[in-house]
Each structure stands twice: as C-alpha cells, then as structure tokens.
Amino acid sequence: PISVGHNVTIHGATVKDYALIGMGSTILDHAVIGEGAIVAAGSLVLSNTVIEPGSIWGGVPAKFIKKVDPEQAKELNQKIAHNYLMYSQWYK
C-alpha cells in the first residue's frame, strides 16, 4: 500500500510499497519512488529521478532531505491509511 495526498499528479512513475506522496505533489515520467520514501507536500519530482528507499525528498525541484527509519515510514503510512478508512465511515 501507498499513501497519496490530495491533488497529487503521478505521471508515468513507479511508486513502491509504503511510500507517502504529500498533498499537491507532482511526480513526472519515469521517476521511481522507493519503498518507504516520503515526498514532501507541494514537491516536484522531475523525470527520471530515483528516490532511494527510506528517504525524504522535498522542494521544487525535489531534492534529498534526509534518511528515515524504514519502520517509521511504514508505520506512518499505515496510520494514514487507517485514518482515511475511519474518515470514510463518517460519510456513509
């Protein structure tokens, strides 16, 4: 599973498990978002960019910020997914 924020555009890119794509981000052709990686909100990931697993990238264009513990990234992704399931129940 992955988490994709509101108003995100992913165009011809590969997004691996437990990645988190922040709201309003754009991921361009042939980019690869590694497992457990985080793309900060509002970021622009350029074509052919490879984001290593367990790293945080952000900005326009997106650049490496720091490494993150893969287990923390996985837990964050699962928490977000759980919250969205909870929110969906509010509108039944």
Listing of model-derived features with the role each one plays in the protein:
Residues 3:
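Short proline/glycine- and basic residue-enriched helix-capping loop/turn segments at helix->loop/beta transitions
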